[in-house]
C-alpha cells in the first residue's frame, strides 16, 4: 500500500517546538477541541497572520488499521476544493511520518447539538434560517458528488453569529456501509430506513432523511424517532410514523412528512424542498445563487499586500502560487485564510444577526464541555414518551436524575482485559453461540436462526480507552468473504474459557498499551478446533438479529 507521505511534501511538515508549544508548519497548536473518529482536533494559530484554525490530526496507524488510506487521499483532494459559507473549509494538509494534519476553518460557537441541549427548541423563524443554511451546504456537496451519510446536530457547528457550518462533510463517506452504526456513537436515530435495514442506497436520499430529523429537532427540541428498545426504535423508523406537536405550522409539517418519507423514491429531493412554500420564506439569495461559483477569480489587493508584509515576499511570488493553483504553498494558504476570514465577517454583517449572540450561547461552560460519547436515554415527559434533546445534556442529567442508557454498541469496564474476555467467553458459551478467535481480544461470533437456518454474525473487539478503562465493541458482520480470507482462526462451538487464560499478559504489558487514547489490544492467535467455516450467503438485513445478539450477550454479562 502506497504511503500517504508520497503525495505530500515533508520539508515543512516536521513538528517543532515554539516556546514550549507544538508547531506544525506555520501553525502553533493549542487546546484540544474534541476527539473524532481518526484522532484529535486542536485549535491552531497561524504564526504570521494570527488567524485561528482547527487542526484535525489523523493518526496514520489508525488510518491503516481501518483500511481507508486510498479513500482519505481522494476525499481530501476533493474537500480542498470546496468553498461554501456553511461548510467547514479545509485550508491545507500537512503530512508527517506519524500523522496527517488537516488545517480547517475554526468556529467558536460549538455544536448545534449542545445549543439545543442548553436552550431547547428554536422558534420557527430561527429554525428555518439554520435549516436553509444546512440544506444549502448539503446541496453544494451533492452537486459535487459528495454525500455526508452521517448528518446530525453534532456535525453542525455554529459560529459566533449563530450561522451553521457542516463539519466532516465527505470524511464520513470514507466509511464502509457496514460501519455506519459503529461510527455514529451507537445512535441510529438519524439513520434512514434503508440504512438500518441494510438495503442499497445511492446516497443523497439518506442525507435528506437526516436533514429532516435535524429540522424536527430544531423545531421541537426532540427526536422524531426514539425508543429505549432498539428493535422498537428500528420499527418506528421503518414505519415512518412520528408525533407532530400542535404548535407546528401545517406547512412545515407537510415538509417534514415529505422529507421523512420511508420510500426513498417518494422522499423529497433538494429541488422539492427548495420549492416548498415554507422553505422559500425569507430565503437569502446567496444560499442558492444562479451562478454556483462561491469564490472570486479576482485578486484581492489588500490580502495580497498583507501576505507580502507577513512573509516578506514579493507580489510576483504570491501571484505565481495563486495562478498556478498551488494550494499547498504557505503563501496561497495564508492568502485564502485572510480572504475567508474577511468574507465570513462581511457575510455575517450582510445576511445575519446584527447583534451579538446571547451570553448563554457563548459561555465558557458551553464552549468547553466535552463531546458526548453516546446519547443517554431520557425520562419521558408525556404519555407519548417524547425525549427532549435538552435532556441529552450530561451536565443537566446529573441534576435531573436522568437514568443511564440501557444499550449502546459497546460495554465499558475497568476490569483486567483477560478477565473481561473470560466473562465474554462464558456468556457466549451459555448462549450456545458459535465463535472463532482471531486473537485473544478479537472474536467473531455467529448464531443460527432456528426458523430460517441462517446465521447472524457479529464481532467482539476489546479496545483500550485509557490507562484504566476498556471498551468491548460490538459490530455486525455481513462480509463472509472477508471472514473466510482472514484464515487466522477457525470456528469453535462452546469452547473452553481456559483458551483465553492461556493468552494472558502481565499488567505491565497492558499498561504499556495505555499510551494511545484508543488502541486495539492484540496478541498471538489462538487456534482452536477446526470446524468448517460457513460461507452460505445470508439474505437481506440482519441488523435486528445483530442487536438481539447484543442484547442477549449484555443480559448475560450483567448477571
Swiss-Prot record:
Main location class: cytoplasm
KW Metal-binding (keyword) present: yes
Binding-site residues, ATP: 33-41, 56
Mechanisms controlling activity: Activated by phosphorylation on Thr-183. Binding of AMP to non-catalytic gamma subunit (PRKAG1, PRKAG2 or PRKAG3) results in allosteric activation, inducing phosphorylation on Thr-183. AMP-binding to gamma subunit also sustains activity by preventing dephosphorylation of Thr-183. ADP also stimulates Thr-183 phosphorylation, without stimulating already phosphorylated AMPK. ATP promotes dephosphorylation of Thr-183, rendering the enzyme inactive. Under physiological conditions AMPK mainly exists in its inactive form in complex with ATP, which is much more abundant than AMP.
Active-site residues from the entry: 150
Chain spans, region Disordered: 485-536
Region (AIS): 302-381
Subcellular location: Cytoplasm; Nucleus
Cofactor: Mg(2+)
Subunit structure: AMPK is a heterotrimer of an alpha catalytic subunit (PRKAA1 or PRKAA2), a beta (PRKAB1 or PRKAB2) and a gamma non-catalytic subunits (PRKAG1, PRKAG2 or PRKAG3). Interacts with FNIP1 and FNIP2.
Name of protein: 5'-AMP-activated protein kinase catalytic subunit alpha-1
Gene this protein is translated from: PRKAA1
